[in-house]
């Protein structure tokens, strides 16, 4: 079975072709921020990214008619259980409207549906374990204020895939195991997996958990309040400090850990301190 996979990121799109479990090829397109910034919304990037992916297929000599199934990265939908979901019009409308948040992952389902259509409708299109997977136990939803309920937004696809892989290595299924799984990318999320369900997880998009290359993580609430009411920043600027321009970007001006390691090797004591702090915070969350 030929499976075409589409993973849109903020400034990139990764695509891959699989024959069952075997990867045939994969490619990552990277876009200049100047190009992406010209689009007024995530949804308005759909046509651009579709055409760019078509260029890869042309280079590979592959037609969408060859695909049996197409899987797009799941975006910010209403909370749902983990699993595989077939893409439909309502899902696409919800994602493109950014009703539950704006993120490049919202383009995964629309792009998958576009390529299914381009292939003449032979292939079915799906998303798997989107970032809004919500399997929290009731206690995990409670914060210290009744007006604020915790929500589940995390790297569900990666976390659940790693849990399945770990269980398989032990000759078990995830239903037989309990894990703590840490995803460490531009954002960091740490989840408690109980027999296949993620019953609690740090929500890096809402400012929980450890800092990461691009996110602030949890901050002292009092000092954050002072920053918010200082009159120096708009709401959008504060949000940018929490997600996108926090963490390593805020401290060191880069989200590239390879660059940070080079600085440490060259004797940059500040880079070493911040790197140790990031590791410490992830360890503490685990």
Residue ranges and their predicted role:
Residues 27-65, 91, 95-101:
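N-terminal phosphate-binding loop and adjacent alpha-helix
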Residues 57-104, 124, 132-144:
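Short beta-strand-loop/turn "lid" adjacent to the catalytic site in phosphate-handling enzymes
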Residues 3-44:
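Short glycine-rich, Thr/Ser-proximal phosphate-binding strand/loop in the N-terminal lobe
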